Amino acid sequence: MPIERNPCVYILASGHYGTLYIGVTSDLMKRLWQHRNGATPGFASRYRVYRLVHFEMFGDMERAIAREKQLKNWQREWKINLINGENPEWRDLAVGLGFAPMAPRGRRNGS
C-alpha cells in the first residue's frame, strides 16, 4: 500500500510573537509529534518552538519546498503579518488536529 503524502509548510512559534521555526514535511501529524516529543534535536527543540501557528497544504512537494524557501527569506514582520492574518491569537492549531494542548512555558531554571 503506498504511503500517503501531504506536502505542507508549517510555522511553529515558542509563544505569542516568540521565536519562529519554518519547516516543510510530507506528513504534518508525524512531524508535529516529533517536534512536541523532542524526537528531533535541533533549532525547534533548543528554542522550545512547539506551537503550530500557521500551515499551508500543497499538491506536490516541489511547491511546498519553494514556499518554505520563500517564507524563510521573508522579513520577520511579514511572517508575523501572515500569522496574524489567519491566527491573530496565535492559538496552537495542532490542538484542532487532535494534539493535546502544550503545558504553559515556564522558566528554564524551574521557578
Residue map of PLM features:
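Catalytic/regulatory signature loops of cyclic-dinucleotide turnover enzymes
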Residues: 72
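A short, polar/charged loop-to-alpha-helix boundary motif
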Residues: 77-83
